[in-house]
Amino acid sequence: MNIHEYQAKEILRSYGVSVPNGRVAFTVDEAVEAAKALGTSVCVVKAQIHAGGRGKAGGVKVAKSLEEVRTYASELLGKVLVTHQTGPEGKEVKRLLIEEGCDIQKEYYIGLVVDRATSRVVLMGSEEGGTEIEEVAAKTPEKIFKEYVDPAVGLQAFQARRLAFNINIPKKLVNQAVKFMMGLYQVFVDKDCSIAEINPLVVTGDGKVMALDAKLNFDSNALYRHPDIMEYRDLDEEDPKEVEASKYDLNYIALDGNIGCMVNGAGLAMATMDIIKYYGGEPANFLDVGGGASEEKVTEAFKIILSDPNVKGIFVNIFGGIMKCDVIASGIVAATKQVGLTLPLVVRLEGTNVELGKKILQESGLNITAAESMADGAQKIVELVR
């Protein structure tokens, strides 16, 4: 789960991690009032969306007067911001962070992620702050330094200090930087983060180490332990289809193609998308209905797939183990009738009660194309949507 920058900074502040003073605003008047309350000569007006690259897209403005705050807030609120992370459709700006300006002397990058290769949290740092870390990794990987954290003891101060020296934090500010990194690590662990990224971390003219921007992502599987984090969820920033799917414990991710997929099991779902691509088609989604799909769940899955106007056909690929093929077949028939499906539908069933499942489909009287194998099904749906 993602949250906004201002929310991430609230969490960091509660752990003693240094961030600029700022206030969130939902209207132009609130933005002006926030700037007044800050009482600084320079304010930064920052668009709040769940995407990076806001500065390059014109989503961050420096205001030197209340009138400029009003002007920039008017420009940004309601604007569709397109960045390299939003896709061409962009995201509408519905809230702003009004923040005090900083006298930036130097920018750095600090981040925490889980390294799957070592099964450890890794603390990363670079003095190439303010740019995409992926770009730095591709062009100048030697400028990224890493410290691997032993989960038994956690991040040690000597590791944070070594990283601070490696990325050339001024010596007089190393202790500040160490405190910053230790606090960031504590947030990462306590809140079950998947990413904690500060880009840039800045050194200011008055000798402070501060998070100028902050990104926290959380492990969705651990959110049941964090009702406080769940309160930060902004459904406006999420795909409505994905939100609806989560209500029924369906794993749905929207893609750009025109062939809707309904599959049980993440591995089979990925293989299904691959084979559709192999035969020249484009999957419209990843949809895993799980191992215990009911008739209601299958119906909702169909509704979610069909809510995508780009979908021109549906491929249902089910291997019945825990889930029985006759239950899935009954669900498919009921869902097809309920939603009034007119698009091509190809169904491949295999596993428990497969013959009974196929019989239910054949006797339904509906226009359902049966497939004998995954490859056969993929070829048929690709041909039908052409």
UniProtKB/Swiss-Prot annotation:
One of its GO terms (biological process) is tricarboxylic acid cycle. Substrate binds at residues 264, 321-323. The keyword Repeat does not apply. ATP binds at residues 46, 53-55, 99, 102, 107. It catalyses: succinate + ATP + CoA = succinyl-CoA + ADP + phosphate; GTP + succinate + CoA = succinyl-CoA + GDP + phosphate. It holds the Pfam family ATP-grasp_2. Mg(2+) binds at residues 199, 213. Its EC number is 6.2.1.5. Its cofactor is Mg(2+). Coiled coil: none annotated. Pathway: Carbohydrate metabolism; tricarboxylic acid cycle; succinate from succinyl-CoA (ligase route): step 1/1. Residues 9-244 form the ATP-grasp domain. GO terms for cellular component: cytosol; succinate-CoA ligase complex. Keywords: ATP-binding, Ligase, Magnesium, Metal-binding, Nucleotide-binding, Tricarboxylic acid cycle. Belongs to the succinate/malate CoA ligase beta subunit family. This is Succinate--CoA ligase [ADP-forming] subunit beta. It comes from Geobacillus thermodenitrificans (strain NG80-2).
